[in-house]
Design a protein with these regions (language model features):
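Hydrophobic alpha-helical segments
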Residues: 1-199
C-alpha cells in the first residue's frame, strides 16, 4: 500500500509545533496553561477572519470561515451574511487619518459610527473589536484610541476590559505570523525548487 507523501515544513517541525501551540492559546486554549478567554470563540474567530481579509491570506480566510460557519451552526444562530459584513468592515478600516484631509476624516468617523452601529445590532461589539485588531496590526494609534473608547464603554470593568484587549491582541499576534507564513510558503518553495530543494 502506497503511503501518502507528507510535505516537510520550510520552518521545521519545532517551529510549526510552536505555531500550533500559539493557535491553541489564541483560540481553543491549552488546558492548565492558557489564561481564560474573555471573548467567546466566535468573536475571536470573526476577528481572525477579518485579519485574514486584511492581510489577504486566502488559506486563513477559508480556514477561519469554516470555523465560524461551524460555530454559528452549533449555536443555531439566525442567518446573517457575516462574510459580506466583515468584508465591509475591513474595507472601512483601510482608511487611516493620515491618508485623508481633516474634513474627510470627520466624515469617515461619522459614517463609521453608523456602520458599526448597524453591525452591533447583529453582533454586539464586533465592528469595534475588529477596528481595534486592525489598529493594533498596523500600529495605528488613532484607530486604536477610537476603538478603545468603544471597548471601554462596552466593558467598564477593568479586569474584563483587560481580558478583551488580551484576547484581541493574541489574535493579532497569531494572525500576523500565520498569514505571513501561509502567503509566503509557496514563494519560498518555488524559489528553493529552482535550486533542487524540495520542501
Amino acid at each position: 500500500m502506497a503511503g501518502r507523501a507528507v510535505r516537510e515544513s520550510i520552518q521545521g517541525q519545532p517551529f510549526n509545533d510552536v505555531l500550533n501551540e500559539l493557535h491553541a492559546h489564541t483560540f481553543s486554549g491549552s488546558p492548565g496553561e492558557s489564561d481564560p478567554f474573555t471573548l467567546a470563540e466566535l468573536e475571536r474567530e470573526y476577528i481572525a477572519y477579518a485579519l485574514a481579509l486584511y492581510y489577504q491570506c486566502d488559506h486563513c480566510q477559508v480556514y477561519h470561515g469554516k470555523v465560524i460557519d461551524r460555530l454559528r451552526a452549533a449555536a443555531a444562530l439566525a442567518d446573517w451574511p457575516w462574510r459580506g459584513e466583515v468584508l465591509k468592515t475591513v474595507l472601512y478600516l483601510r482608511t487611516s487619518k493620515g491618508s485623508v484631509s481633516a474634513p474627510e476624516w470627520a466624515g469617515w468617523q461619522e459614517s463609521w459610527r453608523r456602520f458599526a452601529g448597524r453591525i452591533h445590532h447583529r453582533h454586539p461589539g464586533l465592528a469595534c473589536a475588529v477596528a481595534y485588531a486592525v489598529g493594533i496590526s498596523r500600529a495605528d494609534e488613532t484607530l486604536m484610541d477610537m476603538a478603545f473608547e468603544s471597548l471601554r464603554d462596552r466593558f467598564p470593568d477593568p479586569a474584563t476590559l483587560l481580558g478583551v484587549v488580551r484576547d484581541i491582541d493574541r489574535v493579532v499576534v497569531f494572525m500576523k505570523a500565520a498569514t505571513s507564513k501561509n502567503r509566503t510558503d509557496p514563494i519560498l518553495r518555488r524559489q528553493l525548487g529552482t535550486c533542487g530543494v524540495r520542501v
